[in-house]
Amino acid sequence: GTLQTIKKNETFTYRSDGWKDQILSWNGYRYTYDAGGNPTLLRGVPLTWGEGRRLNKVSLSWGTVDFAYDSDGKRVRKTSGGNTTTYYYNGNVLSGLVRKAAQNAGTAGIGTTVQFVYDAQGKPFMLRLNGKTDYFYLYNGLGDVTGLVDSSNQVVVRYQYNSWGKVTSTQDNSGVSLATLNPFCYRKYVYDPETGLYCLGSRYYDPEVGRFVNVDDFETLTYQLDSVQGKNLYQYCFNNPVNMEDEDGGWPKWVTQVLVGTAVIAAAAALTVETAGTGTALAAVAVGALKGSVIGAIGGTAVGKIQEQQL
C-alpha cells in the first residue's frame, strides 16, 4: 500500500533550558527531577532515590514497590503488594530467587524457589521451580525470551514485545504463574511487571518511552568521556533498540544474532514464533537436546545454591 497519513500517537515535551535531554511530560504525564538528574516523577509516578542514584521506591496507585541493594549495587530484594522477592547471585550472575507472601516473610524454608541454569554463552536456558520442575527458555533471533517450554514439550508461557521491549502480550498456561516468576524477558533483562521497568544492574530502563530512567553512573561517563560528548545521557542503545542491547546499563553493544548451531533451543524458539505456536515439536527437539547437559549443571556453579539468609 501507499503511506497516506502519519498517525501521531505519542507526545513528548523537553526542557527548553538547563538539561535539555530531560523530558518534562509524556502524553500529558509529568516528569520532575532532583539535582542529580534522577526523576522524582516518572510519567506522573513518584520515585524515591537513595545513595545518589539508586531507585528505592516506586509509589503506584495501589501501593509501593520497594527495592534494596547490596554494597556492590546489586539488587537483592523487591517488596510489592505484600510479596517479597529475594535475589541470589553467583558473582554478578543472577542464580536464583525466592518469593514469599507477607505471612511467610519471616519463616525460613517457606516460599517459591526459582533457580537458573545458563549456557556457555551466559544465556539463561533453564528455570527450575521449587527444586523439582524444569522449564526451558525459548528465544527469537535477537535474544528476547519469547516463552518457556516444560519437560512434556509444551509451550506454557509466551511473551510478545514491541521494538523497544515493552511487553505487549503475555500468555501463561503453566498453572503456577510462571510468567510472573520468570524475571527474564526482552533481551534477557530482568523485568518488573509491577512497574513495567527493566532492571539492568546500574540503572533501570523504561520501554514505555524507550529511555533509561536516569543517566549513566560517573564511572561509565568518565571511561567513555569522548564517546558521550554531545549524546543524550538518558537514551537507550543510541535509539537503536533492534540492533543493540545494554546488559548492565553502562554501554550498549551490537546484538549477537542467534545461530542454529550455538543453541538448539533458540532455533526452536525462533521457529515457534514464526509459525505462531506450531513450533512445539521443534521445542521438543530443543528440550531433548538440553536435558542431558542440564542434569550435570544443577547444584553446581552454574546455578549456585539458594539458602535463607539475613540481609
How would you describe each model-predicted region?
Residues 1-6, 15-25, 33-41, 49-58, ...:
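A short glycine-rich beta-turn/N-cap micro-motif
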Residues 7-9, 26-28, 42-44, 60-62, ...:
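Glycine-centered tight beta-turn/hairpin loop motif at sheet-sheet or coil-to-beta transitions
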Residues 10-17, 113, 126-201, 208, ...:
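A motif-centric feature for acidic-aromatic and gly/ser/thr-rich catalytic loops and repeats
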Residues 10-12, 29-31, 46-47, 62-64, ...:
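A short acidic/small-residue loop/turn micro-motif
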Residues 11-13, 30-32, 46-48, 64-68, ...:
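Short, surface-exposed charged micro-motifs
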Residues 245-255:
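Polybasic, low-complexity binding patches
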Residues 255-274, 285-311:
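Membrane-active amphipathic alpha-helices enriched in small hydrophobic residues
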